[in-house]
């Protein structure tokens, strides 16, 4: 399934399609036993952007960073993605991991900020 998902994502990016909220909750899939393949669909399509060119490598990695799957499947997807695109696998793994870590840190920072803001608002009311 991850191999098929990597191929699906490559096709999107090569066609200049970027889903700004590319995560598991916005990706539907089903296995077609007759054809022996997976089919994927995107939802929440109001967050999609269409470019007249394929996405640049950093744009692709930034788009993939939102996948909140465990590390091993994420790295496998990056590996297959790089192989399908003909990119250097180690470079793709490094870039993808870097952007994912930055995204995770940003999410943690935002969560802590909201918690502190809520705590401060609670003290003012009390």
Residue ranges, per PLM feature:
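Conserved kinase catalytic-core helix
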Residues: 1-20, 25
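Activation segment
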Residues: 21, 31, 49-51
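Positively charged, low-complexity, intrinsically disordered RNA-binding extensions
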Residues: 22-27, 70, 74
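Conserved protein kinase catalytic/activation segment
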Residues: 26-42
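C-lobe/activation-segment region of protein kinase-like
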Residues: 38-117
């Amino acid at each position: 399934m991850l191999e098929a998902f990597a191929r699906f994502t490559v096709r999107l990016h090569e066609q200049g399609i970027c889903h700004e909220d590319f995560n598991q909750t916005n990706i539907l899939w089903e296995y077609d036993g007759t054809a022996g393949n997976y089919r994927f669909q995107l939802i929440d399509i109001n967050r999609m952007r269409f470019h007249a060119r394929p996405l640049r490598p950093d744009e692709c990695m930034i788009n993939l960073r939102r996948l909140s799957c465990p590390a091993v499947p994420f790295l496998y997807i990056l590996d297959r993605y790089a192989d399908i695109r003909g990119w250097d696998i180690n470079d793709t793994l490094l870039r993808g991991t870097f952007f994912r870590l930055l995204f995770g840190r940003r999410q943690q920072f935002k969560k802590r900020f909201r918690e502190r803001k809520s705590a401060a608002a609670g003290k003012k009311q009390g």
